[in-house]
Protein backbone atom coordinates (compact mmCIF):
# COMPACT_ATOMS: atom_id res chain seq x y z
CA UNK A 1 0.00 0.00 0.00
CA UNK A 2 1.45 3.32 -1.05
CA UNK A 3 0.86 6.15 1.39
CA UNK A 4 1.06 9.71 0.09
CA UNK A 5 1.18 12.86 2.18
CA UNK A 6 0.75 16.27 0.61
CA UNK A 7 3.19 19.10 1.33
CA UNK A 8 0.54 20.65 3.58
CA UNK A 9 0.22 17.39 5.56
CA UNK A 10 4.00 17.20 5.97
CA UNK A 11 4.12 20.83 7.11
CA UNK A 12 1.32 20.27 9.64
CA UNK A 13 3.03 17.11 10.90
CA UNK A 14 6.33 18.97 11.37
CA UNK A 15 4.56 21.84 13.16
CA UNK A 16 2.80 19.42 15.52
CA UNK A 17 6.07 17.64 16.26
CA UNK A 18 7.79 20.95 16.97
CA UNK A 19 4.99 22.07 19.30
CA UNK A 20 4.83 18.78 21.18
CA UNK A 21 8.59 18.41 21.39
CA UNK A 22 9.19 21.98 22.51
CA UNK A 23 6.68 21.64 25.35
CA UNK A 24 9.29 19.76 27.40
CA UNK A 25 11.80 22.58 26.91
CA UNK A 26 9.23 25.24 27.84
CA UNK A 27 8.28 23.27 30.96
CA UNK A 28 11.95 23.11 31.97
CA UNK A 29 12.31 26.88 31.52
CA UNK A 30 9.05 27.72 33.31
CA UNK A 31 9.87 25.47 36.29
CA UNK A 32 12.60 27.96 37.22
CA UNK A 33 9.94 30.54 38.13
CA UNK A 34 6.53 28.82 38.39
CA UNK A 35 4.99 26.01 40.44
CA UNK A 36 4.29 22.86 38.38
CA UNK A 37 0.52 23.15 38.80
CA UNK A 38 0.54 26.79 37.64
CA UNK A 39 2.31 25.62 34.47
CA UNK A 40 -0.35 22.93 33.98
CA UNK A 41 -3.12 25.49 34.55
CA UNK A 42 -1.61 27.91 32.03
CA UNK A 43 -0.97 25.15 29.47
CA UNK A 44 -4.53 23.86 29.72
CA UNK A 45 -5.97 27.38 29.70
CA UNK A 46 -4.16 28.36 26.51
CA UNK A 47 -5.24 25.08 24.89
CA UNK A 48 -8.86 25.68 25.94
CA UNK A 49 -8.87 29.10 24.28
CA UNK A 50 -7.43 27.60 21.08
CA UNK A 51 -9.93 24.74 21.04
CA UNK A 52 -12.90 27.05 21.65
CA UNK A 53 -11.78 29.35 18.83
CA UNK A 54 -11.44 26.32 16.53
CA UNK A 55 -14.93 25.06 17.45
CA UNK A 56 -16.45 28.49 16.81
CA UNK A 57 -14.58 28.84 13.49
CA UNK A 58 -15.71 25.37 12.33
CA UNK A 59 -19.22 25.94 13.75
CA UNK A 60 -19.08 22.68 15.71
CA UNK A 61 -21.85 22.45 18.28
CA UNK A 62 -21.08 21.30 21.81
CA UNK A 63 -22.93 18.23 23.08
CA UNK A 64 -26.01 18.70 25.26
CA UNK A 65 -26.05 15.29 26.96
CA UNK A 66 -24.96 15.21 30.62
CA UNK A 67 -23.64 11.69 30.02
CA UNK A 68 -21.37 12.91 27.22
CA UNK A 69 -20.14 15.83 29.37
CA UNK A 70 -19.31 13.43 32.22
CA UNK A 71 -17.33 11.26 29.80
CA UNK A 72 -15.56 14.35 28.44
CA UNK A 73 -14.63 15.38 31.99
CA UNK A 74 -13.18 11.92 32.63
CA UNK A 75 -11.28 12.14 29.35
CA UNK A 76 -9.95 15.57 30.32
CA UNK A 77 -8.61 14.14 33.56
CA UNK A 78 -7.09 11.03 31.94
CA UNK A 79 -5.69 12.72 28.83
CA UNK A 80 -4.70 16.15 30.13
CA UNK A 81 -4.88 16.93 33.85
CA UNK A 82 -3.08 13.80 35.07
CA UNK A 83 -0.41 13.53 32.34
CA UNK A 84 0.34 17.27 32.31
CA UNK A 85 0.65 17.30 36.12
CA UNK A 86 2.81 14.16 36.19
CA UNK A 87 5.14 15.34 33.42
CA UNK A 88 5.56 18.83 34.87
CA UNK A 89 6.19 17.46 38.37
CA UNK A 90 8.55 14.85 36.93
CA UNK A 91 10.56 17.50 35.14
CA UNK A 92 11.47 19.05 38.48
CA UNK A 93 14.11 16.31 38.74
CA UNK A 94 14.83 15.28 35.12
CA UNK A 95 15.87 17.09 31.95
CA UNK A 96 13.59 18.02 29.06
CA UNK A 97 15.53 15.63 26.81
CA UNK A 98 15.04 12.67 29.12
CA UNK A 99 11.36 13.54 29.61
CA UNK A 100 10.84 13.56 25.85
CA UNK A 101 12.51 10.16 25.49
CA UNK A 102 10.42 8.69 28.31
CA UNK A 103 7.31 10.21 26.70
CA UNK A 104 7.84 7.77 23.81
CA UNK A 105 6.61 5.04 26.19
CA UNK A 106 3.08 6.19 25.27
CA UNK A 107 3.36 4.27 22.00
CA UNK A 108 4.46 1.13 23.86
CA UNK A 109 1.56 1.39 26.32
CA UNK A 110 -0.79 2.19 23.44
CA UNK A 111 0.06 -1.04 21.64
CA UNK A 112 -0.37 -3.10 24.83
CA UNK A 113 -3.60 -1.43 26.02
CA UNK A 114 -5.28 -1.39 22.61
CA UNK A 115 -4.55 -5.10 22.16
CA UNK A 116 -6.00 -5.70 25.64
CA UNK A 117 -9.15 -3.55 25.53
CA UNK A 118 -10.09 -3.11 21.88
CA UNK A 119 -11.37 -6.23 20.14
CA UNK A 120 -10.49 -4.88 16.68
CA UNK A 121 -6.88 -4.18 17.71
CA UNK A 122 -5.03 -7.47 17.96
CA UNK A 123 -1.47 -7.63 19.24
CA UNK A 124 0.95 -7.93 16.34
CA UNK A 125 4.71 -8.27 16.48
CA UNK A 126 5.09 -5.73 13.66
CA UNK A 127 3.43 -3.09 15.88
CA UNK A 128 5.84 -3.83 18.70
CA UNK A 129 8.77 -3.67 16.28
CA UNK A 130 7.43 -0.33 15.01
CA UNK A 131 7.30 1.02 18.56
CA UNK A 132 10.86 -0.15 19.25
CA UNK A 133 12.10 1.48 16.03
CA UNK A 134 10.25 4.69 16.91
CA UNK A 135 11.68 4.83 20.43
CA UNK A 136 15.15 4.11 19.01
CA UNK A 137 14.76 7.03 16.61
CA UNK A 138 13.80 9.32 19.47
CA UNK A 139 16.81 8.20 21.51
CA UNK A 140 19.10 8.88 18.54
CA UNK A 141 17.50 12.28 17.90
CA UNK A 142 17.44 13.49 21.51
CA UNK A 143 20.81 12.02 22.36
CA UNK A 144 22.12 8.82 23.85
CA UNK A 145 23.68 10.80 26.74
CA UNK A 146 20.16 11.41 28.08
CA UNK A 147 19.66 7.65 28.40
CA UNK A 148 22.84 7.48 30.46
CA UNK A 149 21.30 9.97 32.90
CA UNK A 150 18.55 7.51 33.90
CA UNK A 151 18.56 6.98 37.68
CA UNK A 152 16.22 4.29 39.03
CA UNK A 153 15.89 6.23 42.29
CA UNK A 154 14.63 9.38 40.53
CA UNK A 155 10.85 9.71 40.98
CA UNK A 156 10.62 12.19 38.09
CA UNK A 157 11.28 9.42 35.58
CA UNK A 158 8.47 7.30 37.00
CA UNK A 159 6.07 10.25 36.96
CA UNK A 160 6.73 10.86 33.25
CA UNK A 161 6.34 7.15 32.43
CA UNK A 162 3.08 7.07 34.43
CA UNK A 163 1.89 10.09 32.40
CA UNK A 164 2.47 8.14 29.19
CA UNK A 165 0.38 5.29 30.56
CA UNK A 166 -2.48 7.75 31.09
CA UNK A 167 -2.08 9.07 27.53
CA UNK A 168 -2.46 5.53 26.17
CA UNK A 169 -5.27 4.67 28.59
CA UNK A 170 -7.21 7.82 27.67
CA UNK A 171 -6.93 7.13 23.94
CA UNK A 172 -8.32 3.63 24.39
CA UNK A 173 -11.00 4.79 26.84
CA UNK A 174 -12.13 7.51 24.42
CA UNK A 175 -12.34 5.04 21.55
CA UNK A 176 -14.67 2.86 23.64
CA UNK A 177 -16.73 5.51 25.48
CA UNK A 178 -16.76 8.48 23.09
CA UNK A 179 -16.85 6.76 19.70
CA UNK A 180 -20.04 8.65 18.71
CA UNK A 181 -18.73 12.10 19.67
CA UNK A 182 -17.08 14.37 17.07
CA UNK A 183 -13.28 13.97 17.52
CA UNK A 184 -12.95 17.77 17.51
CA UNK A 185 -14.98 17.75 20.74
CA UNK A 186 -13.34 14.76 22.39
Which role does the model predict for each range below?
Residues 1-15, 48-75, 92-93, 119-129, ...:
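Membrane-interface interhelical linkers
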Residues 1-38, 89, 149-176, 180-184:
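Glycine-/small-residue-enriched transmembrane alpha-helix faces in small-molecule transporters
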Residues 14-18, 41-45, 73, 77, ...:
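Residue-level signature of the transmembrane alpha-helical core
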Residues 19, 23-24, 52-103, 136-140:
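Specific transmembrane alpha-helical segments of multi-pass solute transporters/efflux pumps
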Residues 21, 29, 42-44, 72, ...:
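Hydrophobic alpha-helical segments, especially transmembrane helices
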Residues 33-82, 107-113, 166-173:
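Transmembrane alpha-helices of multi-pass small-molecule transport proteins
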Residues 38-49, 79, 87-126, 163:
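Specific alpha-helical transmembrane segments that line the substrate/conduction pathway
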Residues 51, 73, 105-107, 112-113, ...:
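Hydrophobic transmembrane alpha-helices of multi-pass small-molecule transport proteins
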Amino acid sequence: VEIYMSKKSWLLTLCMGAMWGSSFLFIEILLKTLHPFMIVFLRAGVALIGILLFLVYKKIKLPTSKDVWLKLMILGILANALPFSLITSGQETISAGLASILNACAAFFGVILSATFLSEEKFAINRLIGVIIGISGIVITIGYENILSIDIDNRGQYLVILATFFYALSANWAKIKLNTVDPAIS
